[in-house]
Amino acid sequence: MENIKSFARYIFKTLGAGFSERVYHNSLEVLFKKHSVDFVSEQQIPVMFEGQEVGKVRADIVIENKVVIELKRGSSLRDKHTTQCFMYMKLLGINEGIIINFPENDCDEVEFQEICLAQLCNRCGRDSHLASGCYARTHVKGYAL
């Protein structure tokens, strides 16, 4: 996770604020390729219901099938961003995720939110809360309560 954070900080320091999410996304891809990081960009994930595919969602970047990266550009992260990353992780069976928010102003810093599904659930006390559907803010590292 630290390399991912370092890459994001480097991109923001070099480019600055004001660019679209796509520009920051493409910049991360450049660094991942340069450093031989195995990744999939815009990974399509089927959504199944009653054995039928009812739609697809798309994760921004998946690293080595172990970490979901969700990119944002805006003033701050919101609960819906956490829910979105959590959903991708659940559908892919991946335990780690990180949301990266590139701020709108040069004077702000890149914001990170790590999500680890291997942690014990503080709400229900189980470590298999994905199956139970339990989800609380306390599952998220770095979440500003």
Label every model-predicted segment:
Residues 1, 17-21, 25, 29:
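Nuclease catalytic cores
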Residues 122-145:
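A short, cysteine/histidine-rich metal-binding "knuckle" motif
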Residues 26, 56-58, 62-63, 117-118:
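N-terminal, polar/charged subdomain of small-to-medium soluble alpha/beta proteins
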Residues 72-120:
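Nucleic-acid nuclease catalytic cores
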Residues 1-17:
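Interdomain/boundary linker segments immediately adjacent to catalytic/signaling cores
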Residues 29, 35-51:
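A short acidic/basic microdomain associated with nuclease active sites
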Residues 16, 39, 59-75, 88:
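Conserved catalytic cores of phosphodiester-cleaving nucleases, focusing on short active-site segments
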